[in-house]
Design a protein with these regions (language model features):
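Short linear, low-complexity motifs centered on an aromatic residue
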Residues: 30-48, 153-165, 169
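Short coil/turn linker and secondary-structure boundary residues
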Residues: 22-26, 68, 104, 119, ...
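Mixed-charge (acidic/basic) macromolecular-recognition segments
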Residues: 33-131
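Acidic, proline/glycine-rich low-complexity IDRs
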Residues: 5-11, 125-173
């Protein structure tokens, strides 16, 4: 999924030019060959996000990409198979304050978070009722279920998050 992914490495050295890169290999190659106007190698860069998918953009925001984290970012970006994994990862890091390191994988937190897509708590309650989360309810009793009250109860266990333009509700285990 990284075919549109583009970054710019802006040197902190004002006598040097930056460079665009789309992969770790390209970054390493350009990093090693880039010199300032005095012929000295450039050591520090600000990494600027230029282009990518919605999931790659969110991943960039989550990882607070700095020069030393470029290999980790590309490792995680290569693991993107769907938006759900990135949403789960975003919630784990941003809302649940999970720590990430060089060994972290994109799906490490999937088993710890239950995510549901809905616009409001009432929509979530109605979704749960329709999916049978309350068990089999006889037809003659279905009109007595108060979706608003159930939605209010769900607020105790589920939290709302806006990730990648999606409103999701999650519960962590």
């Amino acid at each position: 999924m990284t075919n549109t992914l583009t970054f710019f490495a802006q040197p902190y050295d004002i006598s040097a030019c930056g460079f665009y890169f789309t992969s770790l290999d390209e970054y390493n190659s350009k990093y090693k060959s880039n010199v300032n106007s005095y012929g000295q190698p450039i050591e520090e860069y600000e990494i600027q996000y230029i282009n990518g998918s919605k999931a790659e953009t969110e991943l960039f925001a989550i990882t607070s990409l700095e020069q030393m984290h470029i290999p980790q970012y590309f490792k995680l970006a290569d693991q993107i198979t769907n938006d759900h994994d990135v949403i789960s990862f975003s919630i784990a890091v941003n809302d649940l304050h999970k720590k990430i390191d060089a060994d972290t994988n994109l799906d490490d937190f999937n088993d710890e978070i239950s995510i549901h897509y809905a616009d409001t708590y009432k929509d979530l309650a109605e979704q749960f009722i329709d999916e049978g989360m309350l068990g089999d309810i006889p037809q003659h009793l279905q009109n007595y279920i108060d979706a608003d009250a159930y939605a209010n109860d769900l607020k105790c266990d589920y939290f709302k998050a806006d990730v990648m333009g999606e409103t999701v509700f999650y519960m962590s285990f």
